[in-house]
């Protein structure tokens, strides 16, 4: 709506300006042309004054006061064509700035689409589908294989395996036994289960994520734009020069002539054009930056926080270690495990099959026990692969990470462990961010502390926060001290959506990530390449350097013109034309932000 309003103002000025030109130079009715421009100028000045009051009430400063004064002053001394030029510049700059500040259309649509809509309520032997908001605490609910847990609850039957990636971001399967709790939004495994509803839908974990995002969106961080920081001193300088010129000359026209050349073109045009140019350059590099303000913040970020799975890592469990405890070779141990698991749909089974370099052996009499493992007959031997207690009754040295244990003919043979593979570019990305002035790199993960610390050490991250749910991630960001702000958060999943919205700058890895994360973020990396994050920081810093230089060049030129105009040698209409020259210079300089260094 804001963008539409500014475009309407711009076209309103163009249309009425064209009519005024026709009245004066074609119909030779200068009086009507002046009246039309005067009414237009007073009307828009009033609208700008209302906007300025709203801006001041929000705690921000702008350049509207100077612009309003310039319009009113030129109209008061009958320099209405100069006023029209100023109006064109102002409304055109506002429309351009709003174009640069594009926003996401549907911030939470993916979260809402994926949230459970119905539940299977069980009453005795009868199963009935009910709307999710009709579930009450204590209801007995059926959850079929592959379905999303509708509410937070306690397992009445089991065991089962659940995927909590949408909540914690971690891809590893979680085994759940009877009596354990499950969270809404987690995906059930391959066995139908019954659960008792412990919470209503509105109070369950998945809906809590939606609320967290909404809350973060409604409480944006305060931020002072570069143009606003220059606005106050520039406005005061213009009024001082204009007042002195009027005071010494006694001619109010002199006041208008100074303010016309002081119209804040560099602040209104140069910065937005530099930002649009920087956004265009970012887009060419596979990074969608949604607003110009995002680039300003990104250039100032002191802390980068990263989710682990899917961001620093690839989000896929791969075979990490093969540890035999008998004379069996590593290749044979992996072959046995993969052969036994080859018909299973379990995520670890798929990883085993993908990792095996040997031909898979035929498996007969395959029997899979949910959340425990697989038993099969291979080459006349009973092979078991799965949890340690499933494959052997004897105590074994367990891996400190996700693992599949293997036994043959009742003899424990060893285990195959898994890890989430690091992105090959992760370490270089962290080094680049350090080089670009980011001294605090943080990892916030839902994974266990030892694994999170190991990953952080390998890539060069400074702080680690592990075993975090979405609300915990928000708390970590909120508790960062002032000297480590602004903060940028980088993530890829639905579970990252609240923290992306909470951070000063949210960056979503959108190549394979959830739409909810992308829409809650301020910037989206379209390519599956973490180095784009450091590239975004580099582009933001370069863009703001060019924007700052363009603004300062414009201010210096305007100041020189104000001093000259104070002696009465620049008529208002000529001053307005000079302003367009200043516009051209600052715009051409600002466009440098489109190019690489």
Model-inferred region functions:
Residues 68, 167, 267-340, 480, ...:
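Conserved catalytic phosphorylation-site environment of P-type ATPases
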Residues 1-6, 21-29, 35, 49-57, ...:
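Membrane-embedded alpha-helical bundles of multi-pass transporters
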Residues 25, 144, 319, 323-440, ...:
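P-type ATPase nucleotide-binding
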């Amino acid at each position: 709506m804001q963008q539409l309003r500014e475009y309407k103002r711009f076209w309103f000025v163009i249309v009425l300006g064209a009519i005024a030109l026709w009245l004066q130079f074609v119909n030779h009715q200068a009086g009507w042309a002046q009246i039309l421009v005067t009414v237009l100028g007073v009307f828009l000045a009033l609208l700008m004054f209302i906007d300025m009051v709203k801006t001041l009430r929000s705690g921000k400063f702008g350049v509207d006061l100077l612009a309003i004064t310039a319009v009113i002053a030129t109209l008061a001394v009958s320099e209405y064509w100069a006023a029209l030029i100023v109006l064109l510049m102002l409304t055109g700059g506002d429309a351009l700035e709003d174009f640069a500040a594009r926003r996401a259309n549907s911030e939470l649509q993916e979260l809402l689409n994926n949230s459970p809509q119905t539940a299977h309520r069980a009453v005795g032997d009868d199963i009935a589908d009910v709307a999710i908001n009709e579930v009450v605490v204590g209801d007995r609910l059926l959850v079929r294989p592959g379905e999303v847990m509708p509410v937070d609850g306690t397992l009445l039957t089991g065991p089962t395996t659940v995927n909590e990636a949408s909540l914690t971001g971690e891809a590893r399967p979680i085994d759940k036994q009877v009596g354990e709790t499950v969270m809404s939004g987690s995906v059930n495994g391959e066995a139908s289960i019954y659960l008792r509803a412990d919470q209503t839908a509105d109070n369950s974990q998945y809906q809590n994520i939606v609320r967290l995002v909404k809350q973060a969106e409604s409480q944006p961080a305060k931020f002072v734009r570069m143009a606003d920081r220059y606005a106050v001193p520039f406005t005061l300088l213009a009024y001082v020069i204009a007042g002195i010129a009027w005071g010494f000359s006694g001619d109010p026209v002199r006041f208008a002539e100074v303010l016309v050349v002081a119209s804040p073109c560099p602040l209104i045009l140069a910065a937005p054009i530099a930002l649009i140019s920087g956004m265009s350059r970012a887009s060419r590099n596979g990074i969608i930056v949604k607003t110009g303000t995002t680039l300003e913040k990104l250039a100032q970020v002191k802390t980068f926080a990263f989710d682990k799975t899917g961001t620093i890592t690839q989000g896929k469990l791969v075979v990490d270690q093969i540890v035999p405890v008998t004379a069996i070779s590593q290749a044979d141990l992996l072959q046995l495990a993969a052969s036994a698991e080859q018909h299973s749909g379990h995520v670890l089974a798929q990883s085993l099959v993908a990792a095996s370099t040997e031909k898979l052996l035929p498996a007969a009499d395959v029997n899979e026990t949910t959340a425990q493992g697989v038993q099969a007959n291979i080459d006349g031997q009973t092979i078991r692969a799965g949890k340690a207690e499933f494959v052997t009754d004897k105590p074994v040295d367990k891996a400190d990470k996700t693992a599949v244990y293997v036994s043959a003919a009742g003899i424990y043979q060893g285990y195959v462990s898994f890890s989430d593979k690091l992105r090959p570019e992760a370490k270089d990305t962290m080094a680049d961010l350090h080089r670009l002035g980011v001294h605090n790199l943080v990892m916030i993960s839902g994974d266990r502390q030892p694994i999170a610390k190991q990953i952080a050490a390998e890539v060069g991250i400074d702080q680690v926060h592990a075993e975090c749910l979405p609300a915990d991630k928000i708390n970590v960001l909120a508790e960062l001290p002032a000297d480590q702000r602004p903060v940028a958060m980088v993530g890829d999943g639905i579970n990252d959506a609240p923290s992306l919205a909470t951070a000063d700058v949210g960056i979503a890895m959108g190549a394979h990530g959830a739409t909810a994360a992308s829409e809650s973020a301020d910037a989206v990396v379209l390519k599956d390449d973490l180095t784009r994050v450091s590239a975004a920081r580099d582009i933001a810093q370069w863009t703001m350097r060019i924007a700052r230089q363009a603004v300062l060049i414009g201010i210096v030129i305007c100041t020189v013109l104000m001093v000259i105009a104070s002696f009465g040698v620049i008529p208002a209409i000529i001053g307005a034309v000079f302003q367009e020259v200043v516009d051209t210079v600052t715009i051409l300089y600002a466009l440098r932000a489109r190019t690489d260094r």
